[in-house]
Amino acid sequence: MGKAKAPRQLKDNEAKAVARTLRVSPQKLNLVASMIRGKKVNAALADLTFSRKRIAGTVKKTLESAIANAENNHDLDVDALIVAEAYVGKSIVMKRFHVRDRGRASRIEKPFSHLTIVVREVAEKGKAA
């Protein structure tokens, strides 16, 4: 087993937001998370606004929460933020049964996911510090 891993500490120029127990499979959520990873937050918000994926609205809400955390809790400049990390974790899987013909039943699995978004303030290129 080994020791439990310590949670990652945020740096001074970072802020994060976590959405837990989202009713979507981790694979589908990771498609949307990888779409915004590494982008400036304004571009990421625009991409999520016009995405046709069902979960994109929830990801956008989580990203807006991370931006608000950066602005209000960490005093970071919103215009200089990028999506440093956007990762997905597995949560519970609800098991349900679907009645079939001839007296049989099939199992339906309804997966849930966790989403963590970390935004980081980067220095603008070309500006004198």
UniProtKB/Swiss-Prot annotation:
Entry keywords, A to Z: Ribonucleoprotein, Ribosomal protein, RNA-binding, rRNA-binding
Superkingdom: Bacteria
Keyword Phosphoprotein: no
Signal peptide: none
GO molecular function ontology, one term from the record: structural constituent of ribosome
Presence of keyword Coiled coil: no
CDD domains, alphabetized: Ribosomal_L22
InterPro entries assigned to the protein according to its UniProt record, in alphabetical order: Ribosomal_uL22, Ribosomal_uL22_bac/chlpt-type, Ribosomal_uL22_bac/org-type, Ribosomal_uL22_sf
Pfam family, one: Ribosomal_L22
GO biological process, one term: translation
GO CC term, one of those recorded: cytosolic large ribosomal subunit
PANTHER family: CHLOROPLAST 50S RIBOSOMAL PROTEIN L22-RELATED, LARGE RIBOSOMAL SUBUNIT PROTEIN UL22M
Quaternary structure annotation from Swiss-Prot or TrEMBL: Part of the 50S ribosomal subunit.
Protein family: Belongs to the universal ribosomal protein uL22 family.
Function of the molecule: This protein binds specifically to 23S rRNA; its binding is stimulated by other ribosomal proteins, e.g. L4, L17, and L20. It is important during the early stages of 50S assembly. It makes multiple contacts with different domains of the 23S rRNA in the assembled 50S subunit and ribosome. The globular domain of the protein is located near the polypeptide exit tunnel on the outside of the subunit, while an extended beta-hairpin is found that lines the wall of the exit tunnel in the center of the 70S ribosome.
Name the record gives this protein: Large ribosomal subunit protein uL22
Species of origin: Brucella abortus (strain 2308)
Gene name for this UniProt entry: rplV
